[in-house]
């Protein structure tokens, strides 16, 4: 009878649920940070690559026409985009092998 009263009063029954919820929240936050980082990388890396190649590398050091500079910068941006996507896919496929999700009832 006393064990029923302890469970009904919420004695120790709430602590495991709370730590489990904090664990899930921590995993969700970690996943959010990872996805946000790769989204920013996928958006900003090609743009930065285009303008760095165009403004600082190709215009300054090579004597080629503006159209060829733009084409070379665009190719560099596409390569940077593919590298960022490849890193994201690699991380998604091979990244978190240590923490397997286990079902608890």
Curated annotation (Swiss-Prot):
Superkingdom of origin: Eukaryota
Membrane topology (Lumenal): 58-68
Spans annotated as Disordered: 1-26
Membrane topology per record: Multi-pass membrane protein
InterPro entries: Vma21
Family listed: Belongs to the VMA21 family.
Functional description taken from the UniProt entry: Required for the assembly of the V0 complex of the vacuolar ATPase (V-ATPase) in the endoplasmic reticulum.
Protein name (record): Vacuolar ATPase assembly integral membrane protein VMA21 homolog
């Amino acid at each position: 009878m006393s064990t029923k009263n302890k469970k009904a009063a919420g004695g120790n029954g709430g602590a495991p649920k709370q730590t489990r919820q904090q664990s899930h929240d921590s995993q969700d936050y970690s996943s959010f940070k990872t996805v946000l980082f790769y989204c920013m990388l996928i958006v900003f890396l090609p743009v930065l690559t285009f303008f760095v190649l165009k403004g600082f590398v190709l215009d300054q050091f090579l004597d080629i026409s503006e159209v060829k500079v733009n084409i070379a910068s665009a190719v560099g941006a596409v390569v940077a985009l593919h590298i960022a996507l490849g890193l994201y896919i690699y991380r998604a496929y091979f990244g978190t092998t240590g923490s397997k999700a286990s079902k608890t009832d």
